[in-house]
A protein has these predicted regions:
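Positively charged n-region of N-terminal signal peptides that target proteins for export
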Residues: 1-4
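Exported/periplasmic cell-wall-interacting domains
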Residues: 110-238
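Bacterial N-terminal signal peptides
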Residues: 8-18
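N-terminal post-signal-peptidase region of extra-cytosolic proteins
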Residues: 50-68, 80-81, 96-110, 114-121, ...
Length: 238
């Protein structure tokens, strides 16, 4: 009887050790995975304590109905505008710490260029290695159409607004700023957020001599972007 009991104990111990070894070598899920909801609970309160004074000063309710981020490549700035009634109101400006390449649009994978155009946010990434990030829908319809007319392929992708201070082909605004932009986008709804990226502020300059990438369709793109920026006025006069 004692021998049978000992065999059973040894068998159960063996099974437990096997199970432990399997679990150790086959983790069920990577550690540290967070959801957008968790970010809003953990980071939301402190980010919104910094955000709301901007909206109070601008006279816009928070969260707003729609938001536009304007990325100014030459100025290394990201403006935030919110819809109030039928007009757009300036809210805040963030510094851009990292944006590789020069003035001019992105045309292919690996060129290091930050895209230029009007984009939507398609994804909020709470597990980015750049703290937090927001994915843009580059290449958009215009990008694809111009690539087709040029006979180009391999346009690249995975363009983000993200934290940290360095980037290649994306826009890095630092951890503090991306927390605010991430929370603002989540509260507003990604379908209500637009991102306009321009080589320089068309509201202040007519043409910038530093532009070296000049495909035949560039004037059409810049005319379109200029018309878009005209909806937001000049922030210095607000």
């Amino acid at each position: 009887m004692k021998r049978t009991f000992s065999v059973i104990v040894l068998f159960l111990l063996y099974c437990a050790l096997c199970a432990f070894g399997y679990a150790a070598s086959h983790p069920s899920a990577p550690a540290g995975k967070r959801t957008v909801a968790e970010i809003l609970r953990e980071i939301g309160p402190r980010a919104e304590s910094r955000l709301k004074p901007y909206f109070d000063k601008a006279g816009v309710s928070y969260p707003p109905s729609r938001v536009t981020f304007i990325g100014l490549k030459d100025e290394l700035e990201l403006e935030v505008w919110a819809e109030k009634g039928r007009r757009w109101v300036y809210v805040a400006t963030y510094d851009v710490y990292g944006a590789s390449g020069g003035l001019g649009p992105k045309q292919k994978a690996g060129d290091g260029q930050v895209p230029e155009g009007i984009y939507n946010v398609t994804e909020l990434n709470p597990n980015s290695r750049f703290h937090l990030s927001m994915k843009l829908d580059y290449p958009n319809g215009f990008d694809r159409l111009m690539a087709q007319s040029d006979g180009r392929s391999h346009l690249g992708g995975d363009i983000y607004l993200h934290g940290k201070t360095k980037s290649k082909g994306c826009i890095a605004v630092g951890d503090r700023a991306i927390e605010e932009l991430f929370v603002l986008t989540a509260r507003t709804g990604i379908k209500n957020v637009k991102v306009v990226i321009v080589p320089y502020d068309f509201r202040s300059h007519i043409f910038h001599s530093a532009i070296r990438i000049t495909p035949s369709w560039l004037p059409d793109l810049y005319e379109k972007l200029g018309q878009e920026l005209a909806n937001y006025g000049q922030r210095d006069h607000i």
